Amino acid sequence: MTHQTGIHATTELRDFFAKARNGSVRLIKVIIEEEQLVLGAHKELARRWDVDYDAFVLPLLDEQQPCYVLYRLDSQNAQGYEWLFISWSPDNSPVRLKMLYAATRATVKKEFGGGHIKDEMFGTVKEDVSLSGYQKHVSSCSAPAPLTAAEQELQQIRINEVKTEISVESKHQTLQGLAFPLQLDAQQAIQTLKQKKINYIQLKLDLERETIDLVHTSPTDISDLPKRIPQDSARYHFFLYKHSHEGDYLESVVFIYSMPGYKCSIKERMLYSSCKSRLLDTVEQEFCLEIAKKIEIDDGAELTAEFLYDEVHPKQHAFKQAFAKPKGPVGKRGQKRLIKGPGENGEDS
């Protein structure tokens, strides 16, 4: 699993996540205790999601303690019910806790299952993450809008966390992160990968010059991937994953963000985390390179053929069908009924 801060979920929390994903739980509060992610509180289903939202969410938010809240919506996707992920980081909480919770956010989503999360919100005051705040958030996602107070606070937290000056000339900061410029050879490598003339790119941040540099583009098989992951520094990787799926031959670009946890400085961890989303935006929007899967790891040993396949083609949740009642002989079933009983023809009512 990916644990950029060395923090991971307890067995009890993982078990509760599994239970919650079946739809019986409305809310999960997660906190960090003794360097572990633990269950802080939970709420069972009661009424419609929007009716219970403020009554369930707001009382659980401490004015001095960050936390994560997962709130189950009533909509569903192929993997089951969709969830809202809330990162709560109040103004009065210590900077150290803000940094810790910010750096562990990706781990919580991965532990729960990112495919179940429909929306994310960040809040420093309760109004930001209230039902009204969420509705404004959904509206703002459909069109560009000025930064909210919470978004401005998130920017400032990131600036404080990395403890580095940000000049207008060197990079641009938005809610999505920092934008270090791609060096020319890195841009050329991305174009070459798009043309499928190479199958691997490794990039690194130059923390002094504030640029994204090309490390190498060595030909790489799946068996070589673990050796490409440095054990003492972070990297960005693009890999052209050639494989077969359901009888079709596919060539899928996979983005890998490797971060070996505490072996890197806080500044390095925060800068790599902040630059990642802007790099991906640039690659996908400006270079028009389609990325099939984005993966975060802390150890190259995770990159097996089976792991890559499961990440690119996640197994769908199987829904057990009701037992199909056998049909009687043709022509001897009596008069046709207007309303079918539950379970008939193998369908639930």
Swiss-Prot record:
Q: Which Pfam families match?
A: Cofilin_ADF (PF00241)
Q: Where in the cell is it found?
A: Cytoplasm, Cytoskeleton; Cytoplasm, Perinuclear region
GO CC terms in record = actin filament; cytoplasm; myofibril; perinuclear region of cytoplasm
SUPFAM superfamilies in alphabetical order? Actin depolymerizing proteins
Residue ranges of every copy of the ADF-H domain listed in the record = 4-139, 177-313
Annotated region Disordered: where? 324-349
Q: Where are the transmembrane segments?
A: none
Report any one BP term from Gene Ontology. Answer: barbed-end actin filament capping
The family note in this entry says: Belongs to the actin-binding proteins ADF family. Twinfilin subfamily.
Complexes and interactors: Interacts with G-actin; ADP-actin form and capping protein (CP).
The entry's function note states:
Actin-binding protein involved in motile and morphological processes. Inhibits actin polymerization, likely by sequestering G-actin.
Name the record gives this protein: Twinfilin-2
